[in-house]
């Protein structure tokens, strides 16, 4: 068959990788929502969801059916186009951010030379979804939550990007595969410990997870910028949040903990185990820490995280220049 060229085979293999990896990411995000409720019940000495299926194993299926059949209601005075577009942008931007993550040698959807810049671009695109949702809902709580979320996300994305510059300087590349290969002897978490701490804090803030969930604070804003959403539109926001957790956890593993590298076990297993550990940390943080005031969150970012990232970057640059002499 002369029409089957090597280029076509390469394109088909890339599409297959994309479908497999993205389906796994969506599935992990969905199962994390169930696992979080079970673990929070364990941490708080109460029962989690345990009524549907054996030990609550079918709770996720029940939630999906319930959400699918809920009324897809749009407020009367909202901007219908932007209101509908917002959850789609939120879901796809967070999903596309995972495309640059190499889960094992040769298994990456988009092996870009500007991989880290692509991730930061997708993280910035998610801000538009929040602003669109808050403004188009024509609800004061929704708008206030969107303003909080956009200010918080844009602030912490500064620290998110600066915390990665030390890793980029050490690896000499923005390519994620090159960064993983540069950690063959020493993981970046050792020389870039303060960069990792800042990236972890900023990652939690960008995902709007507890204790940085002020944009969705139920006690203050009645669920924030997606208060008017229901049905599958709310489902896209809901699953998108957990996909963001999976993506940030995978990036922590890739950038600071050697990616797929490890002894004995296959590379994909090492990557999955490391990522699952950091996903567990997200849940443990939610169960352990109180929610600070919004002004405290912003003050912490600009007065502590920013100086820490700048000091880390200056020290990294000084060490690289000293080694080059």
Swiss-Prot record:
Entry's localization field: Cell inner membrane
Entry keyword set: Cell inner membrane, Cell membrane, Membrane, NAD, Quinone, Translocase, Transmembrane, Transmembrane helix, Ubiquinone
Reactions this protein catalyses: a quinone + NADH + 5 H(+)(in) = a quinol + NAD(+) + 4 H(+)(out)
Broadest EC class assigned to this enzyme: translocase
Enzyme Commission number, as recorded: 7.1.1.-
Primary localization: membrane
Gene Ontology CC annotation, any one: membrane
Membrane topology term: Multi-pass membrane protein
InterPro entries, A to Z: NADH_UbQ_OxRdtase_su1/FPO, NADH_UbQ_OxRdtase_su1_CS
Highest taxon of source: Bacteria
Molecular function GO terms recorded: oxidoreductase activity, acting on NAD(P)H, quinone or similar compound as acceptor; quinone binding
GO biological process, one term: aerobic respiration
PANTHER family, A to Z: NADH DEHYDROGENASE SUBUNIT 1 (PTHR11432), NADH-UBIQUINONE OXIDOREDUCTASE CHAIN 1 (PTHR11432:SF3)
Family assignment from sequence similarity: Belongs to the complex I subunit 1 family.
NCBIfam families: PRK06076.1-1, PRK06076.1-2
Record function comment: NDH-1 shuttles electrons from NADH, via FMN and iron-sulfur (Fe-S) centers, to quinones in the respiratory chain. The immediate electron acceptor for the enzyme in this species is believed to be ubiquinone. Couples the redox reaction to proton translocation (for every two electrons transferred, four hydrogen ions are translocated across the cytoplasmic membrane), and thus conserves the redox energy in a proton gradient. This subunit may bind ubiquinone.
Protein name: NADH-quinone oxidoreductase subunit H
Organism: Escherichia coli (strain K12)
Gene: nuoH
